[in-house]
Every structure is written in C-alpha cells, then in structure tokens.
C-alpha cells in the first residue's frame, strides 16, 4: 500500500482558478478563508487498517448513524399520514412522493396533492435502499439485488439495471450513469444503454454515494468520512477532503456545490466540486442527519434527530441563514423536497408516518 502523500492545504490552488469556476452568489471572504485554511486536501491508501492515512478519523472506522430521538413533545408541523413501517428514504418528483420502507421489496408512490390517499406500490426484485430523483426520474438502489431501478411515477413501472456490486448511490453525468458500489469501493460508469464502460476504484474505503454538481463529480466515503473528486476523463479518484467527523447524507444545490451533513459534530458542509474545496461549514446542533435542497427557496433542509426538528437554511450568501425551524415526527432520518410544489416531506424511521409540510 502506498503511503499517503503529505498534507496540502486547499489554499495551494490559485485564486484565479477558484474565481473562474465559482458559481452562485459572491460569498464573504472571511468565511471562504476559514474554509480554505481549515480543509486539508489529501490522498490516502485504501487499506482501512493503515495507520498513516490522515483522512482516517479512528483506527476502526464505522459509518455515522442517526442519533436516537426522544418522544415528541410538540405536534409535527403540516400533515402526518401513515407510512406502514419505518421509512428508510424518500424522493419526490412532479408532485409524487416515493417512499422506501424497511424490509420491503417495493417503493410506495404517494400523491402529494392528496398524501392521505392509498399509495401505489411498485414491486422490486430487492429491498429499496437509497432513493434519489435523477433527471426527473425516481431511482432506487437495491443493494441485496445488486441492481438499481428507474421508476416511472406516471405509470408506476420500474426498469431494473443490474450492476457489478452493491449499489448505494446513483447520479447522471450527461448520458452516462454513475453508480457508487459500496462493497467494491468503486464507481461504475454506464453508457446511455446502461452497459458498463469502466469501473473506477482508487483510494476509497467505501463508495457510499456519488454526486454530480458544478461540472464535477464527487464520491462520498462514509467510513473515511470524506469526499473525493472523481475524474471521469482519466478514470481516477482524485483529491479528498475530510467531511467532518461523521459524514452522513449528501445532496447538491444549484450553485454547483455538494452539501453534506456531519452527524457526529453536528454541521452542514458545502463543497465546491471543481476544484474540490470546502466553502461553508454551518454548525447544526441537535443531531444533524438528513439533508435535502429546495431550489425555489434556495433553502437546505436538515433534520435534527435528537430534537425531532427540521431546520431550513438559506444558503445563497456567504454564511447560511436560518429561515425555518419546525417540529417533526419522531426519528426524522429522511427528508426530501418536491420541486414542483416546494413541499418538504419527512419520513419517520420509528413507524410514526410521513410528514408533509408547506412552509
């Protein structure tokens, strides 16, 4: 195993490069400087037992999990409808909510105009893991089946694609599909016909998610609690940045950034992707876990499992500004936003239903 390279701060990149690739509104210099000086850009070997990897937080790394929730003390905001089990993930598109439940080989489709109505059920060849909206289509990973499914919410049908590993995240890059394979510590690239083109597998402990934003692709490694740039031209894993002490959930915003929750330290991190650079770190005490983005309001929604709350931050400026703080169902591990209606939907991982909020 090659020893990790020496530490380099992000400020080693030229300021002109950062300016030319920056997207979205101007951010304050003081916050950007803090982020640049506090973030370390490293590469590391892929042996989890190696002691010299400076991105490794502990000797035997484990993925961060949601903090347990107490009993609720306030009525949840908005409307709560039965889910039929523990909600493990949510995604929404065109006024339709997709919900995955623990232990079910299916995804349930709810009409957000009438969330209390009986949902449609889309059967799958394996238990649904993560859900994501990709180019207007709901995509469900099925780790046990080594496959993912594209779900047409209009017809309630699923197109299943098998992959060479355990999929935990899917993203689109033009006409290519990127699939994070947790067990293979790799990202598989599929062409427009879903045929494998290449598998990129360098310097990861675990490939838990893959995201595309701002002209760049990023891999989330939850074991190492770090994000890594993915060079699709050279088919390599590039530089990495630590994402707090317990990277948990991730999404993207319209400013070309990847937003990551740090479940152990209680924070929301914002990374530019090209080049990979930490731009913002917002403390979010109370058990930060799930994250979703509302492009119409420019608000990042973060669930707080220790408090049974969801908090919304306006992320247009140099520092996130709190705009909303609302009570939720117990154990609010998952959250999504429907871009058509701007409704915020939260799932209880404690069998206490699905919460629909119109802020």
Tell me what each language-model feature is:
Residues 3-32:
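Bacterial N-terminal signal peptides that target proteins for export
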Residues 2-6, 27-29, 40-359:
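Predominantly soluble domains enriched in secretory-pathway, periplasmic, or organellar proteins
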Residues 33-37:
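Sec-dependent N-terminal signal peptides
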């Amino acid at each position: 195993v090659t020893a990790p390279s020496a530490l380099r701060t992000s400020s080693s990149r030229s300021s002109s490069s950062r300016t030319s690739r920056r997207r979205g509104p101007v951010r304050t210099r003081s916050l950007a400087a803090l982020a640049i000086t506090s973030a370390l850009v490293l590469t590391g070997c892929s042996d989890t037992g190696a002691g010299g990897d400076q991105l490794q937080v502990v000797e035997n790394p484990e993925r961060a999990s949601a903090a347990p929730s107490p009993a609720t003390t306030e009525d949840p905001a908005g409307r709560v409808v039965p889910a039929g089990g523990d909600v493990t993930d949510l995604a929404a598109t065109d006024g339709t909510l997709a919900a995955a439940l623990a232990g079910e080989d299916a995804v349930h489709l709810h009409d957000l105009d009438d969330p209390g109505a009986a949902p449609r059920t889309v059967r799958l060849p394996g238990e649904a893991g993560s859900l994501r909206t990709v180019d207007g289509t709901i995509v469900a990973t099925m780790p046990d089946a080594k496959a993912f499914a594209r779900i047409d919410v209009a017809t309630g049908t699923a197109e299943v694609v098998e992959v060479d590993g355990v999929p935990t995240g899917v993203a689109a890059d033009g006409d290519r599909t990127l699939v994070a394979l947790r067990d293979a510590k790799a990202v598989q690239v599929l062409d427009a016909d879903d045929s494998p083109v290449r598998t990129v597998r360098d310097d990861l402990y675990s490939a838990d998610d893959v995201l595309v934003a701002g002209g760049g692709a990023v891999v989330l490694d939850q074991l190492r609690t770090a994000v890594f740039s993915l060079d699709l031209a050279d088919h390599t894993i590039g530089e990495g940045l630590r994402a707090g002490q317990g990277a948990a959930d991730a999404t993207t915003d319209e400013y070309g950034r990847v937003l990551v929750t740090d479940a152990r330290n209680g924070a929301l991190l914002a990374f530019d992707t090209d080049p990979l650079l930490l731009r913002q770190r917002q403390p979010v005490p109370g058990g930060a876990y799930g994250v979703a983005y509302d492009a119409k309001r420019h608000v990042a929604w973060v669930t707080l499992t220790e408090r049974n709350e969801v908090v919304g931050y306006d992320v247009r400026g140099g520092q996130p500004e709190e705009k909303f703080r609302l009570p939720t169902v117990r154990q609010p591990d998952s959250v999504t936003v429907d871009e058509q209606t701007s409704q915020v939907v939260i799932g209880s991982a404690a069998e206490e239903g699905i919460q629909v909020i119109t802020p």
